[in-house]
Structure formats: C-alpha cells, structure tokens
C-alpha cells in the first residue's frame, strides 16, 4: 500500500539526495519530522482546511527548520471551491465530490463543507525543492496542470 512508503526508505533504496520537499495536502504535518531527520533543508507545505492548517502551524512552530506553510488548495485555475470534509479526522477530505470512497469506506461520511481558495503551484515560484509529496484525494492531475513550471525544476 502506498501509505507505507517512507521518504527515508525511498532515499535509501534509490540513493536519492532530497534537498527540499513540497508537501501538497500536508494535513497536520505528521511527515515533517521525517523530512528533517533525513536532512531535508527546505520544506514547503500546502493545506487548505483551516482547522488542519492551524494545527499544522502549531506543529511547525515547534521545529527548528526552514518550513513555509500555505493555507490554500492547489489546482489548475485560481478560484474558490467547496471542500467535502470527511469524518475520519478529515484525512479523506476532497475538492471532488465523494463517490467511490463512500462505497469502499461506508463508515466515513462527508457531512461538513468548507470554502477554500485554490491557487496554482507555479504562482509560488518555489526554489530548492527536488521532491513532491502529494495527497489530494484524486485532484492530483489538476494540481500538476497548475504546476508545470515547478515540475520542470524537480
């Protein structure tokens, strides 16, 4: 399962030198300490949900690292959208209306909503990052469409 893959494991297996990480869909930042532990110097995180971002900011403030956080969703065009908030600690929240998820995980509901701002990854002009972690519940292609220039630098 993809969730079991660690950045440390990837860097060791493929002899990668990860200097900086762009983490899209950072939730509350539980992976950030791993990035720091393996020597990642620059970290840029994106998390659109306000409660998650507040917890993320608090968690980041306790770390002595070069971390920049942005409270936005990323996509292929700038706009405001409604996110569907999941009942599983918002881990499955999505810009896309839940369909298949409801069948595979009937215990998870999407009763709450939150308006979020969507921006282009390219609008951030990120330097010094050579690795992307993305977890946006099926919206990955839209994020990559808005990040073509950034992807060329990775």
Locate each region found by the language model:
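Phosphate/nucleotide-binding beta-alpha loop and adjacent structural elements of enzyme active sites
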Residues: 1-154
């Amino acid at each position: 399962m993809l969730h079991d893959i660690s950045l440390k494991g990837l860097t060791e297996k493929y002899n990668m030198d990860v200097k900086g990480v762009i983490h899209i869909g950072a939730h509350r930042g539980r992976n950030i300490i791993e990035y720091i532990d393996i020597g990642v110097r620059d970290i840029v995180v994106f998390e659109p949900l306000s409660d998650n971002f507040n917890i993320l900011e608090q968690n980041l403030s306790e770390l002595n690292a070069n971390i920049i956080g942005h409270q936005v969703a990323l996509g292929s065009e700038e706009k405001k959208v409604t996110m569907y908030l999941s009942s599983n600690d918002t881990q499955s929240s999505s810009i896309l209306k839940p369909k298949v998820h409801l069948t595979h995980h009937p215990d998870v509901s999407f009763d709450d909503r939150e308006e979020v701002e969507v921006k282009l990854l390219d609008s951030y002009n990120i330097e010094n990052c050579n690795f992307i972690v993305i977890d946006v519940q099926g919206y990955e292609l839209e994020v990559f469409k808005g990040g073509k220039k950034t992807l060329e630098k990775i």
